[in-house]
From Swiss-Prot:
UniProt similarity note: Belongs to the universal ribosomal protein uS15 family.
GO BP field: translation
Gene field: rpsO
Keyword RNA-binding carried by entry: yes
Quaternary organization: Part of the 30S ribosomal subunit. Forms a bridge to the 50S subunit in the 70S ribosome, contacting the 23S rRNA.
GO cellular component, one term: cytosolic small ribosomal subunit
PROSITE patterns: RIBOSOMAL_S15
Biased composition annotated in UniProt, kind: Basic and acidic residues: 1-12
General function of this protein: One of the primary rRNA binding proteins, it binds directly to 16S rRNA where it helps nucleate assembly of the platform of the 30S subunit by binding and bridging several RNA helices of the 16S rRNA.
SMART domains: Ribosomal_S15
Name of protein: Small ribosomal subunit protein uS15
Biological source species: Salinibacter ruber (strain DSM 13855 / M31)
HAMAP family found in the cross-reference section: Ribosomal_uS15_B (MF_01343_B)
Disordered as annotated region, ranges: 1-24
Amino acid sequence: MITQEEQQKIIDRFGNGPNDTGTPEVQIAIFTKRIEHLTEHLEDHPNDNSTRQGLLDLVGKRRRLLNYLQENEIERYRTIRDELELRK
């Protein structure tokens, strides 16, 4: 799980204000940080299937948000993809 400080740094970097957690960019960045954390956990615990399922759920949620941005706000999509170094 990410700490409050990490989450606040993400909000400050990608959000429109200090309490902006609703924009797709902030949500994608938070999901990405959680995905990175769960990926590290699964490297140490490869048989933890409930965590693996949670990871797949997060990847799906992030993908849906990325698809939304790609369809409606292509420049914002390209910016967040490049900043987070996500594959296409």
